[in-house]
Structure formats: C-alpha cells, structure tokens
Amino acid sequence: MTYFLNSDFSKLPLCESIIEVSRAIRQDFPSKRVIEDLKHKVEVARNYVVSENLPFLKLRKLIKLFYKNWKFECASGIYKLSDVLWLDHVLKTHKGTAVSLGIIILHIAQQLNLPLMPVIFPTQLILRADNGNGNMWLINPFNGDTLNKHVLKVWLKGNISPTAELYNNYLNKVQYFEVVRKMLDILKSALMEERNLELALNVSNVLLKIDPKNPYEIRDRGLIYSQLECDHVALTDLIYFVEHCPDDPISEILKIQIHSMEKKVITLH
C-alpha cells in the first residue's frame, strides 16, 4: 500500500483516484489495462462530440454515446455487487452500479472539460450539469435518463421514509473526493456481505488512511477483525467505538460482544 500512502489522491482526477485505491486493495487490479481503456474511450468521445460547439450539447452527445452506442447499463440478474463496482469489471462488461457507471462518465466528461458534476443524493449517486443560465440537468447514471423532482421525491418516499421531503441541499454538487469515499463505503459493505474479508479489511484500512479517527470506520474494521477471529485486534477497535460513541444504539450490542470476546481471550491465555 506504499504507493497509496504517498499519493494525495484527493487532488487527483477522479478515475486516477479510484485506480490508486483499487491498487491498494487488490494486488491483481490491472491498472495499465484500465488506464488504456479509459484513454481510448476519452479519445473516441472527443471525436464523437467535436461537431457540437456548446458544452451542454457536447454533453448530450456524450450521454448518447455512453448509454446508446457503448450500451453501458445497470447490472441485472444474479451478480456479486463487488463485481459491478470494480472499474476493470465494469469496463469489460459495461454493467455497473450508479456509482461505478457515474465514475466512468464523470471521468470522460472531466477530460473533455464538460460541465458534469456528482451529487450524492440520499438514495444513490446522480449526475448534475448546469448550463450557466440557472438551468440544472439531473441525470440517472444507471441509464442516462433525465431526472425530475417528482422522480426524486418518489425515490425518497420509497427508499427512505413515506414522509421524506426533497430538500435543495440534496442536489448540491460534491467534490470527486466524496465520490471515492462513497464507492469505498459501498465496496466495503459488499465485500463483507460476500465474506471476502481480507479485501474488506483492505478497503477499511484505505478508508482509515483517509479519516484515521472516524469511530464508525474503526468499528467496521473491528467487526471485520472479529470475523477473521483476530479477537485481540478487534477488541481494541470495538472498545474505541464504544468509548467514543456511547449514545449510539449499537454500542450496547457491542458491549455484549466485547465482554464475550474478552472472556474468550482470557480463556485462551
């Protein structure tokens, strides 16, 4: 993970950041192939949109190229969530999630200087383009469809709460750095669910390099260590969380787990 530690990836272009963290997590991540594939797609896209003069019209052509011509789409059927998050798999299959598809098209738009930015909506990543005249174009990265406020309200009520409201700040643009964190959070959860604990631990360690004192990240690392039966290390992380977040409801559950683990460690000694 040395190269990751030496990189201030928050200042890197989006896909370069994702490639850096992917290399830190997966030893077999094919960085060279991914970089070459992305460069090729940028050049094809550049030639495809060149006939348009206005950035907004270029962006519309890019959306058409990405979803209609290249046929990038949301994954369906039976699949592992982690497979539709890794950029190498998504570039190979053209099937991904909102965040992985969004990352690729954001990268291409960034390289072409097109006005596309990420929005971390409560239900998923969405894309936003401003035309400079006060008009905002919201795009679903799953399929390139235009989103309106009615659809967003339905998403909130269906996924968050029947009483959820749509607030303006839900549509605020975020920095690419936040997209990297979002992807890592989803990837960590997916790997834990798939019982790929060694890779999940690598993701957790990357997140802790970004935010070393985040008690929730430390808690998750402790839970992974406990599943790997590394109780000694797990105890340190879980106790840290309980001490720093005593009012969190999960702390009471963790106290029981900590007590059980402490008895086990004492017995082994």
Swiss-Prot record:
Q: Which domain of life is it from?
A: Bacteria
Please list which residues make up the signal peptide. Answer: none
Q: Which InterPro entries match?
A: SirB1_N, TPR-like_helical_dom_sf
SUPFAM superfamilies in the record? TPR-like
Q: Check the record and name the Pfam families matching this protein.
A: TPR_9 (PF13371), Transglut_core2 (PF13369)
Q: What family is this?
A: Belongs to the UPF0162 family.
The molecule here is called: UPF0162 protein bbp_163
Q: Which species is the source of this protein?
A: Buchnera aphidicola subsp. Baizongia pistaciae (strain Bp)
